[in-house]
């Protein structure tokens, strides 16, 4: 009887309790959320109205909050990219929740920075505020693309889509390049490092080239029948989002570099960089070309 009771208990655990574990975990998360929301509130509390009477202080608080926003956007993108190879319901939900948090960062920062611009600012202070106003939308858009990428990964998971080995290799390469450009751009922003920011544009061009090459290979696979239309739609969605993330990283780098030259003429800057092909640009381009190729 004891053995029979134990056997029935094992069956109960397998058939009744195990399927409920995921639901129970989700309920615990809802009842006892992590300290992410508390950390967000703590960050937002830096943007106090009374600091607006002291521009140096309000700008410094804005810098700290924008840096936090940048790092959250980077973390969200990395989490989303990781879902393609390692699916997790929890991480998928976290990407969506973090995207909402970053939306609130943009709203609060944008409003606060505009209030700062109405104060009497020195030229350097005005330029710093302009830098933040130029970049918070890029960080928000990067997080938007993280959400898009997570939804593409969910489609891959839900439909059990299997890419060809060639397509998987290509995605691994471009995802590695996107991780790198994001790390460089966010690091350059947080450290206010124009020299590091100068590495972004060469890598952005490499990523553009990879996307073009991958799209061409994708058409070949469709024609040969080694790739289906369903796989193709998701593949193209991923490429589009990776390419746009790189574009936003380029915008961030431009804001950092142009702050040093007292100008925000993005078009002029990019044209001059690409036309001159400075020694550092060419060196970084060749370095990344060797590292990221199909």
Located regions from the model:
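Positively charged, low-complexity/disordered segments
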Residues: 1-3, 7-8
């Amino acid at each position: 009887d004891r053995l029979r009771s134990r056997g029935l208990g094992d069956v109960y655990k397998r058939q009744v309790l195990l399927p409920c574990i995921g639901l129970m975990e989700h309920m615990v998360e809802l009842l006892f959320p992590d300290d992410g929301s508390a950390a967000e509130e703590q960050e937002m509390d830096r943007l106090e109205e009374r600091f607006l009477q002291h521009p140096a202080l309000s700008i410094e608080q804005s810098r700290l909050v924008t840096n936090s926003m940048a790092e959250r956007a980077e973390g969200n993108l990395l989490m989303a990219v990781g879902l393609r190879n390692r699916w997790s319901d929890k991480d998928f939900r976290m990407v969506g929740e973090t995207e909402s948090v970053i939306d609130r960062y943009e709203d609060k920062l944008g409003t606060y920075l505009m209030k700062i611009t109405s104060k009497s600012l020195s030229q350097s202070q005005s330029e710093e505020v302009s830098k933040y106003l130029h970049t918070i939308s890029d960080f928000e858009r990067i997080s938007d693309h993280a959400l898009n990428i997570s939804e593409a990964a969910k489609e891959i998971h839900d439909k059990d889509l299997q890419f060809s080995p060639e397509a998987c290799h290509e995605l691994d390469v471009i995802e590695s390049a996107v991780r790198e450009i994001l790390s460089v751009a966010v690091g350059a922003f947080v450290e206010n490092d124009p020299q590091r920011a100068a590495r972004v544009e060469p890598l952005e061009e490499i990523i553009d080239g990879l996307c073009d090459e991958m799209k061409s290979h994708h058409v070949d696979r469709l024609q040969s029948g080694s790739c289906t239309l369903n796989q193709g739609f998701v593949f193209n969605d991923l490429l589009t989002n990776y390419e746009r993330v790189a574009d936003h990283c380029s915008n961030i780098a431009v804001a950092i570099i142009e702050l040093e030259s007292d100008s925000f003429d993005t078009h002029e800057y990019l044209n001059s960089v690409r036309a001159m092909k400075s020694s550092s640009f060419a060196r970084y381009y060749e370095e990344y070309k060797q590292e990221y190729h199909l």
